[in-house]
Amino acid sequence: MMTIAQIMEKMIAFSEGNIHDITHLSCVWTYAKTIGELEGLDADTQFILEVAAITHDIACPLCRKKYGNTNGKYQEQEGAPLVREFLADTGMTAEQIDRVAYLVGHHHSPAQINDRLLSDDGA
């Protein structure tokens, strides 16, 4: 399975050199990683959290081209299927990819995420 560093490298390449996108995903990942560690998440949940943080804005380049903006609604609509394709060759399980896709597809709609915990055990 790809490491977080390898997924980060892949996402940076996917960002087409957009410094804003790269800086933003790096900041979001740093915050998510730190919060997850401080909360004591298990290794799999921490991994999913970090991958979701790295890929949460994966649809931005496509949205800029297709819609002329990166509106959150468009990011959610385009992001979930795009992240599935992006993660297909990482060695992640289907369940892990499903969870990341769910988070990416709802990251501008937190009310829709609140009904579902980050992990099934309540962590």
Over which residues does each language-model region extend?
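Short, conserved alpha-helical segments within structured domains
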Residues: 24, 45-50, 75, 96-100, ...
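Active-site flanking loop/helix segments enriched in acidic
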Residues: 3-27, 58-69
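Alpha-helical phosphate/pyrophosphate-handling elements in metalloenzyme active cores
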Residues: 18-49, 83-90
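General structural signal for alpha-helix termini and helix-helix connectors
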Residues: 13-17, 34-38, 60, 64, ...
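An amphipathic alpha-helix signature
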Residues: 4-8, 29, 76-84, 101
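Histidine/acidic-rich helix-loop-helix segments that form or flank divalent-metal centers
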Residues: 92-123
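Short coil/turn segments at secondary-structure boundaries
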Residues: 66-74, 87-92
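His-Asp-centered metal-binding catalytic motifs of divalent-metal-dependent phosphohydrolases/nucleases
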Residues: 46-71, 79, 101-110
